[in-house]
């Protein structure tokens, strides 16, 4: 956390309004994402973060504010109650979208990591649905989707999954690499 006020020999001065500029905040978010993604790659962790909005990422879900444990506990009062209600309404709409089109969940999950577990899927669906009934419907819709590909067990014995679109992307990349390898006259 940073103060928005300039510190001088006389104490705190006026607020630095430059820090409120959207372009600067977006630049900070992009640099943070780059930093985190480098650290994840150095540790061979198959996950990435994206600083862009869901819309900019091509994910057709509504963004939701994070509702922390403290806000959830106090639940029925004032502004927090309004935020919680809006969060639930958005989660309900997102859950309906996932039930209608399970590929939305698969695309969002594989946008962050190439493969995922049942737990990753459950956490995603939980975050984007409202209540047990909708969670079950959305989770089952994704699990029964023909676009969900089971890869097998990982080193921890957990089932790993990906999407048909991710497999197709990897196959296109493999074919492109093979084509490039066959040509000796390309410049690098």
Q: Model-flagged regions — what are they?
A:
Residues 3-174, 184-187:
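Single-stranded nucleic-acid nicking/binding segments centered on His-rich, glycine/basic loops
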């Amino acid at each position: 956390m940073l103060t928005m006020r300039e510190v001088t020999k006389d104490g705190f001065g006026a607020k630095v309004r430059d820090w409120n500029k959207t372009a600067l905040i977006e630049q900070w978010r992009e640099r943070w994402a780059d930093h985190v993604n480098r650290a994840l790659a150095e540790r061979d962790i198959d996950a990435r973060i994206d600083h862009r909005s869901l819309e900019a990422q091509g994910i057709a879900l509504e963004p939701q504010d994070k509702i922390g444990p403290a806000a959830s506990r106090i639940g029925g009062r004032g502004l927090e109650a309004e935020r919680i209600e809006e969060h639930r309404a958005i989660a309900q709409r997102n859950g309906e979208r996932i039930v209608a089109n399970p590929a939305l969940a698969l695309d969002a999950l594989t946008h962050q990591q190439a493969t995922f577990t049942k737990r990753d899927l459950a956490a995603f669906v939980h975050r984007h649905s409202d209540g047990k009934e909708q969670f079950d419907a959305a989770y089952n819709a994704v699990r029964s989707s023909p676009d969900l590909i089971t890869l097998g067990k990982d080193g921890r014995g957990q089932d790993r999954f990906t999407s048909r679109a991710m497999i197709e992307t990897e196959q296109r990349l493999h074919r492109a690499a093979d084509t490039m390898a066959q040509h000796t006259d390309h410049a690098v």
